Amino acid sequence: TTVCLAIPLYEKLVYLKKYPVAIIGGILAGMFACLGGVLVLSMAFGLDHTQYVTLLPKSITTAIGMGLSEELGGMVSVTVASIIVTGLFGNVAAAAIFKLFRIKHPVAIGVSCGTGAHAMGTSRAREFGEIEEAMSGLSIAVCGLLTVVGASIFAMIQF
């Protein structure tokens, strides 16, 4: 899988060099939207701390999300289910969301697919094009690493 994601990225390295601020900014915005959304909804629905930290890794790839959930004291099986549901929703809704918001730039499409819907989003990004696929693959890795740090900080929030 890593090689399959790395080859398109290497071939489209020019886009990474051309749009580094947009790519990192998009990944950070997506990560904070996910973590902030989980925080707000957890407070609104009265979830306890265990349920809250269980949902924090919902927008990263399963391999990273399982370890993060366990480290934060979450319920790993529920985390896996939330990751799958998030990925499925992102995969199914991606085209409609891009059309609704008139998002046409291949880098923006790729970053949002990888950041918001991880591997399932990347499979959808591949249907849009090679640039989208490469940016989505990059976003999976970077978002996963940043979310480990971000979720650890968000997990300290008590409500």
Can you name each region flagged by the protein language model?
Residues T1-L16, A63:
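Hydrophobic transmembrane alpha-helices of secondary-active transporters
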Residues V3-Y10, C34, V38, A94, ...:
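Alpha-helical transmembrane segments of polytopic integral membrane proteins
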Residues Y10-V21, S42-D48, L68-M75, K99-I103, ...:
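Short juxtamembrane and helix-loop transition motifs at transmembrane-helix boundaries
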Residues L13-V38, V80-F89, S139-G144:
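Entry/N-cap segments of selected transmembrane alpha helices
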Residues M43, V149-F159:
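Juxtamembrane boundary at the C-terminal end of a transmembrane helix
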Residues Q51-V78, I84-T86, K104-V142:
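Alpha-helical membrane segments and immediately flanking helix-loop junctions
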Residues L88-A93, G144-V149, I153:
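Hydrophobic transmembrane alpha-helical segments of multi-pass transport and channel proteins
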